[in-house]
Amino acid sequence: MKARRQRKILELIKAGLVKTQEDMVNALKECGFNVTQATVSRDIKELGLIKIPGGNNAFRYALPGDRPFIRGEERLRRVFRDSVIGLDSSENLIIVKTHPGGAQGVASAIDQAGWREIIGTVGGDDTILVVVKPKRAAGAVLKRFEELSGG
């Protein structure tokens, strides 16, 4: 069942029919799959889907191969500019706000950047918690994030 559902997700992505997880849930239900948003979220992560600009200030899901793969700092810069809409901090914690559905991709890019001051990220749908160690490095990390997001 999972393999069939994930094949259908890939078909829907290739057809450009889904822009949000809610769209995905509805499209899958129309195709006879009984799914929840949590199931779709896990499938998106397992399939490695990404959100890319789709025009008119909207984003859409795509396969990683639909966009040239960019590594390191340049990838982080692009992901931040495309997805991040706000930053805040408290002590050694930084909150990164993204467009809906953008948090997983941004959190992954942060993790892959390998900054030694960042010991981990937790990404939801539109919010990421970044844990910084040592605490005194949080200000510098926040400043780098602001620069990456164009702020």
Swiss-Prot record:
Compartment list: Cytoplasm
GO MF annotation, one: DNA binding
GO cellular component, one term: cytoplasm
One Pfam family linked to the record: Arg_repressor_C
The entry's keywords: Amino-acid biosynthesis, Arginine biosynthesis, Cytoplasm, DNA-binding, Repressor, Transcription, Transcription regulation
Record GO biological process: L-arginine biosynthetic process; protein complex oligomerization; regulation of arginine biosynthetic process
Pathway note: Amino-acid biosynthesis; L-arginine biosynthesis [regulation]
Location, primary (coarse class): cytoplasm
InterPro entries found in the cross-reference section: Arg_repress, Arg_repress_C, Arg_repress_C_sf, Arg_repress_DNA-bd, WH-like_DNA-bd_sf, WH_DNA-bd_sf
HAMAP family given in the database record: Arg_repressor (MF_00173)
Protein family: Belongs to the ArgR family.
NCBIfam families found in the cross-reference section: argR_whole (TIGR01529)
Function: Regulates arginine biosynthesis genes.
The name this protein goes by in its record: Arginine repressor
